[in-house]
Amino acid sequence: MVTGVQTCALPILRRDFPEHFTLFQALPGVEARLSFEALITWQSTLMYRLRQVRRLLPFSPLLAGDRGWFELLPASGWSYHEELNYYEDLPVFYPATRINFNCTSQQMKGAVNQRVFDVPACGGFLLTDYRRQLENLFEPGREVICYHEEGEIPELVRHYLSRDAERERIAAAGILLLLCHTFAVYL
């Protein structure tokens, strides 16, 4: 479930896995406990993102990034592009892609990640998981599209793949990000 309201790992560990929480408490020192919590957060992010990406497979997505996808997904139903350079490749890639899909790291809780700014700023269309902070930065539904529940992903993808003009209008509205979200505005 995607609610935009995430909690840190420890309350969940205490509530749902008390035997593991006891082991966590027995770890020697703060460093070991922080490392354990980071591991849980990274693993939960991997599991979360993998669930979301699997919902895209009926649409034969292009996945860009490291080769780890080959270990996690079936061999067919998607294509691969190696990692893209942030400064040189992504500003060209984002607007050339019909739907840029984002699922935020679990460590972000209610905050958005950099992709939520980058895709609209480059003139790309963004489908992202809802986070509370989004409403302070964008007008969801006008500048970016959000899914609140995992089950919404296939229908939203189907909808926007079949409506070029609507998708392009939303992407164009997102470009206003360049005018509204600058260092001068926030300083």
What residues fall within each predicted segment?
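Short glycine/serine/threonine-biased micro-segments
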Residues: 2, 63, 172
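Single conserved hydrophobic/aromatic residue that forms the stacking wall/gate
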Residues: 1-8
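Loop/turn elements at helix/coil->beta-strand transitions in domains of secreted/extracellular proteins
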Residues: 59-60, 98
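Catalytic binding pocket for nucleotide-activated donors in carbohydrate/polymer assembly enzymes
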Residues: 67-187
